[in-house]
């Protein structure tokens, strides 16, 4: 019995769950912090020697598979995992595009803030970027409470150019930057290894975030993939989130049954106002319908009405006007001929 119950649930999930989907992630930060190099590293897995200057916005697409948490561990991989596409919108940070880059802030699922570890001012300006996106953007599956600058979607902070910062002695080390950063974040209790969700930092500037060196193809791939899967889960599998989770917001709608009762009661009141008192067939000559058809309205006529044919067994002959005129004319003609003969 349990086997059939699980099989029925898996079939239902396969029918209802989307076969594929997409989430949109903004990549914002000051000009020159390495956003284009980071997006190229995430999508291609390799560094770019001379990244071109971004004009307006550049979109990169990353393919990722996601399995529904409600799927059974014994189910086939093809049935539980589905394909999704992560759109990484690399928005130019140059001041010349300040007045028009809000065109790209639409239907946002998440934000990646990028700053340069060798230039502290680029991290300070992240607050300005958060306020700009929150004020002019539209969002998909927003959070119940906003983050920095009122940003209503999940975000993550990436400190890029850790290799340059290490050489200058500003921040970082010459060792494995990914392991060092992950160890520090887990030590601070910000990134539990057993959790699907990533920490959201409350304000800028602050300690924490991911460390990357796009030129040396170093970044925390696992953490970013968790971030992308969290966005997919919030958009396409929101019913599987815990009830008290802060990741979803849903106003309390009017239930369909309550609305149906209201409509039914209104119809009853209208029927009571327009109904006859007593038997409506008592004071006219109409024949009452069958009891089962009393409250049913006749179906609409979908074809033109045909004229009723008259039977031919009448005792009184009927003549048309033309035949009468023809008979009259024949009689007058005969009388004239008789007069002539006489």
UniProtKB/Swiss-Prot annotation:
Family annotation (CDD domains): RabL3 (cd04102)
Binding residues annotated for GTP, in chain numbering: 29-36, 90-94, 160-163
Region (Disordered): 274-313, 323-342
GO molecular function, one term: GTPase activity
Regions of compositional bias (Polar residues) in chain numbering: 323-333
Effect of inactivating the gene: Short-period phenotype even in darkness and short hypocotyls in response to red and blue light but not to far-red light. Altered cell shape and increased ploidy levels at the seedling stage. Hypersensitivity to salt stress.
Expression triggers: Not regulated by the circadian clock.
Recorded GO CC terms: cytoplasm; nucleus
Matching InterPro entries: P-loop_NTPase, Sigma_54_int_dom_ATP-bd_1, Small_GTPase
Keywords, alphabetical: Cytoplasm, GTP-binding, Nucleotide-binding, Nucleus
Pfam families, sorted: Ras
Annotated stretches, region: Small GTPase-like: 12-285
Domain of life: Eukaryota
Compartments where found: Nucleus; Cytoplasm
GO biological-process terms attached to the record: circadian regulation of gene expression; photomorphogenesis
Family according to the record: Belongs to the small GTPase superfamily.
Function recorded in the entry: Functional small GTPase that acts as a negative factor controlling the light-dependent period shortening of circadian rhythms and light-induced phase resetting during the subjective night. May protect the clock from excessive or mistimed light. Suppresses red and blue light-mediated photomorphogenesis and is required for light-controlled inhibition of endoreplication and tolerance to salt stress. The entrainment of the circadian clock is independent from the other pleiotropic effects. Could be a regulator of seedling establishment.
Protein name: Small GTPase LIP1
